[in-house]
């Protein structure tokens, strides 16, 4: 069974130590609930990932583990076959011992867009909400973060993350916990909190912003990326049914409306640092994710619209600061 004991040890003397009052019981319950089903099968695959300590690790410019020179052709083919068991791979890309995991998303492009606008992550304790398989967590570590914690309830994402971590080395201070943000107590401890590609999946976006605020220390930085539409501060799209074939999209505000939401949640120093239309080159089907992707979600006669007739995906990134506690928004 996937163990979280090393995470408990790493936070025992940190600003997150009070989390240990509740977290082991929550994750213990998760472990009991996942004794059967797909997780034990995937764990057998993870237990086969015994490979040499990588000769190189680059987390600054990419997520690259091993030069490819340490494994013979047959060993590399065996490793690739093991990693393919965890398909579909959605967020990346990763390079592992000469194997290029070409994921659906070019998550490195998003990172390059937002990185210049972040407060330096060096020596920071960071939370990534809805972290997927953890690509951006490794890039945060590459920027010098002291601790990186990701939360995502997907068992597949957890196993993909564990596969990369076992190949990179378990000593790295980066951990994925199979939790949703609603399972976190108000920790008031993280220096930086990321929420990227999550807000539009939440039935109550203001509550999500308050949950993010409650994880930050006073003066901590929020990095929020979500789908937006054009319009003024009163413009919010609520899809009648599906958006881009997704049935779990609830609210798409304009950038101006989202700024008001952040103010309502008592954030200050709010800045929209990037607005970008998702391109067919950034999100696409690949050999590692052979299912439908963005091109299938757009109107075949007009790529500016989804198949439902809504504006095509456009993403905005906001950076904001947690204000001094001076009013009750709960």
Curated annotation (Swiss-Prot):
Gene that this polypeptide is encoded by:
cmoB
Q: What is this protein called?
A: tRNA U34 carboxymethyltransferase
Species in which this protein is naturally found: Shewanella sediminis (strain HAW-EB3)
Taxonomically, which superkingdom?
Bacteria
Q: Which Gene3D superfamilies does the UniProt record give?
A: Vaccinia Virus protein VP39
The family assignment reads: Belongs to the class I-like SAM-binding methyltransferase superfamily. CmoB family.
UniProt xrefs under InterPro entries = CmoB, Mo5U34_MeTrfas-like, SAM-dependent_MTases_sf
Q: How does it assemble?
A: Homotetramer.
Role: Catalyzes carboxymethyl transfer from carboxy-S-adenosyl-L-methionine (Cx-SAM) to 5-hydroxyuridine (ho5U) to form 5-carboxymethoxyuridine (cmo5U) at position 34 in tRNAs.
Q: Which UniProt keywords apply?
A: Transferase, tRNA processing
């Amino acid at each position: 069974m996937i163990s979280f004991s090393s995470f408990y040890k790493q936070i025992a003397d940190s600003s997150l130590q009070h989390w240990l009052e509740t977290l082991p019981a929550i994750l213990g319950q998760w472990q009991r609930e996942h004794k059967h089903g797909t997780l034990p099968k995937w764990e057998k695959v993870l237990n086969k990932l015994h490979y040499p300590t990588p000769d190189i690790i680059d987390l600054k410019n990419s997520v690259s583990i091993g030069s490819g020179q340490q494994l013979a052709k047959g060993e590399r083919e065996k490793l690739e076959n093991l990693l393919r068991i965890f398909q579909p791979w959605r967020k990346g890309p990763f390079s592992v011992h000469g194997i290029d995991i070409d994921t659906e998303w070019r998550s490195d492009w998003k990172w390059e867009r937002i990185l210049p606008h972040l407060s330096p992550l060096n020596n920071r304790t960071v939370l990534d909400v809805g972290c997927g398989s953890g690509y951006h967590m490794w890039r945060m570590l590459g920027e010098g973060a002291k601790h990186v914690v990701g939360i995502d309830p997907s068992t597949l994402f957890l196993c993909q993350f564990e596969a990369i971590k076992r190949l990179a080395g378990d000593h790295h201070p980066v951990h994925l916990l199979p939790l949703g943000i609603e399972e976190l107590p108000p920790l008031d401890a993280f220096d930086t909190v990321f929420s990227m590609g999550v807000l539009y999946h939440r039935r109550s976006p203001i509550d999500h912003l308050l949950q993010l605020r409650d994880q930050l220390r006073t003066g901590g930085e929020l990095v929020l990326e979500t789908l937006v539409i054009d319009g003024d501060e009163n413009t919010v799209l609520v899809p009648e049914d599906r958006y881009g074939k997704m049935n779990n999209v609830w609210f798409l505000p304009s950038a101006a409306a989202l700024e008001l939401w952040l103010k309502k949640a008592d954030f200050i120093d709010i800045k929209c640092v990037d607005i970008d239309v998702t391109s067919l080159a950034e999100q696409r089907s690949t050999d590692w994710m052979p299912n439908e992707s963005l091109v299938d979600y757009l109107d075949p006669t007009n790529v500016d619209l989804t198949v439902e007739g809504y504006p095509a995906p456009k993403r905005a990134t906001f950076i904001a600061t947690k204000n001094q506690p001076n009013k009750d928004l709960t």
